[in-house]
């Protein structure tokens, strides 16, 4: 009952924020927050939107199999955020876009525009469903199975809660709710770390030294080119993951486009980029501490990395407070990710697919429809997924965000004009070719593609657009 009471109290606060920010909200407020968002709130809220429930569960467990090598990817993230801030944001602000995929219509044509928007809908719906599924499974495990509540009911109830507090204010509401949820998530993480350190009988300086001396604190891998943990694979993948999953993601860019000016948007992007490194370092450090904790009580580590955090909390030895903190942290992380995803999906559908940005009736209907489809995706993923959740998201991104990367790079960095009618076929063929290459190379050479599959996918799309016959040239590169 404590967990249920915690969630209800948390949700009441979100509803209060929604009531305040949703007053007299029209479509412009829902889609763009009237372009009046303070940059520092956007920057802080984006931490919670990116560090989802998946991060809360999976990143601490990564140290079991790959030590702290995930930090190599996080270092790449920093350069990726600077690239987005100074290469993509100027284009979006100059064109005064509501959705970033409108750029594809201006530069490449209507088929490319619809293709990009459609791929985003699939990519974001899939990735957000993965993240949200984590919270639903954990709530089932901790509370709801005891009361015999089926998993589908849990999913429907939580999505309905999100719909309630986002249905009026949209992105204007989310700027504030994401700030609140990020505060809750980070406080929960820090307090959990403190509680684990206290249980181990250490001071904070002693714990920091113990983590640094632990064999699982190893970060850099330079000597194994075959390994997925090789530095250059992870670092370069981190750069492109951010460019694609933030810079080409309507969800993330929609918040940035609510800032008053380009300069403020760039400040918020760079600030957030730097903040991502210490945040993930805390999650990985928690993973090392949890392994120390299991060793100290003589308990075997779980078979699956994703269960490291869950087993520590479910065991009960860390106390009821940790259970409450964990619930707050993971619900905050998941809600801040899912609510913005539903808003971005609704925006893209209304503006890009239907071409009716001022139709409030359509927006309200689309918001309900997107929520229903979101529920279906969660249920599908719950019953078919068996891989590590964080890897699942990035694998999905490699196949669905890759064509977006190729289309945007082609439009921004060349003066050529694509054969617009062929773009949908290119966007479908590229992921299929990547899947075939990944399978063949793995079986014949033993080389395993990591997150760099995203770059390969984008490169194939770019080359196909570049070399296939184009219609008559008449458009210049936006980056002239």
Where are these regions (language model features)?
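Helix-loop-helix junctions that connect adjacent transmembrane helices in secondary transporters/permeases
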Residues: 61, 65-168, 256-395
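Hydrophobic alpha-helical segments and their helix-loop junctions in multi-pass secondary transporters
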Residues: 17-23, 124-132, 136-153, 164-167, ...
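Hydrophobic core segments of alpha-helical transmembrane domains in multi-pass membrane transport
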Residues: 6-17, 81-85, 120, 137, ...
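Small-residue-rich segments of transmembrane alpha-helices in multi-pass membrane proteins
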Residues: 39-46, 107-116, 181-194, 274, ...
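Membrane-interface "cap" regions at the ends of multi-pass membrane proteins
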Residues: 1-56, 166-169, 182, 188
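Juxtamembrane interface elements at the cytosolic ends of transmembrane helices
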Residues: 13-27, 87-101, 164, 168-171, ...
